[in-house]
């Protein structure tokens, strides 16, 4: 949620604007829907590139975020340099080095290889203006994923 706040999500009930203007691209691991307000408005002002990463079993150990609610963020983002990967079978801990208590799915070592490839290309494309990295994200990123993983761009 912090990354979402500092990189463009709006919070209508907040007296301050949490956006950090020096951030020009951001990666969301386990994106979250807003707890209050209109979700469409919350994400309408995201003006920088975002890469969202989640899994088909990405349930929050605290809070009320579900694997399904995490998938609801991407469609609400405005078009232009927005990307999402959904790792098949991945739980909330897929983005860490170890499983969390209560995890029930076996960890997939390819997820970390894909995370490394996707985030490196994303930051190369967005922060270094690397045309080859951007082309890879839009045309070939699927090559590091497994058959049931989902890759989306807009």
Model-derived regions, located:
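Short flexible/disordered coil segments
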Residues: 7-15, 91-96, 146-154
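Active-site-adjacent alpha-helix of alpha/beta-hydrolase-fold enzymes
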Residues: 44-116, 125
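Primarily recognizes the serine-hydrolase "nucleophile elbow" in alpha/beta-hydrolase
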Residues: 1-45
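A short, terminal or domain-edge coil/loop segment
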Residues: 1-6, 85-88, 139-145
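Intrinsically disordered, low-complexity boundary segments flanking structured domains
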Residues: 13-16, 68-75, 137
């Amino acid at each position: 949620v912090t990354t979402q706040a500092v990189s463009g999500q709006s919070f209508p009930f907040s007296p301050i604007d949490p956006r950090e203007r020096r951030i020009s691209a951001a990666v969301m691991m386990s994106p979250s829907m807003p707890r209050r307000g209109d979700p469409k408005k919350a994400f309408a002002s995201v003006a920088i590139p975002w890469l969202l990463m989640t899994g088909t079993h990405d349930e929050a150990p605290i809070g009320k975020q579900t694997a399904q609610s995490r998938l609801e963020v991407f469609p609400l983002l405005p078009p232009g340099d927005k990307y999402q990967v959904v790792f098949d079978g991945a739980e909330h801990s897929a983005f860490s080095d170890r499983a969390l208590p209560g995890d029930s799915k076996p960890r997939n070592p390819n997820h970390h290889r894909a995370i490394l490839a996707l985030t490196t290309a994303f930051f190369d494309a967005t922060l270094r203006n690397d045309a080859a990295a951007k082309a890879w994200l839009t045309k070939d990123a699927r090559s590091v994923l497994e058959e049931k993983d989902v890759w989306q761009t807009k």
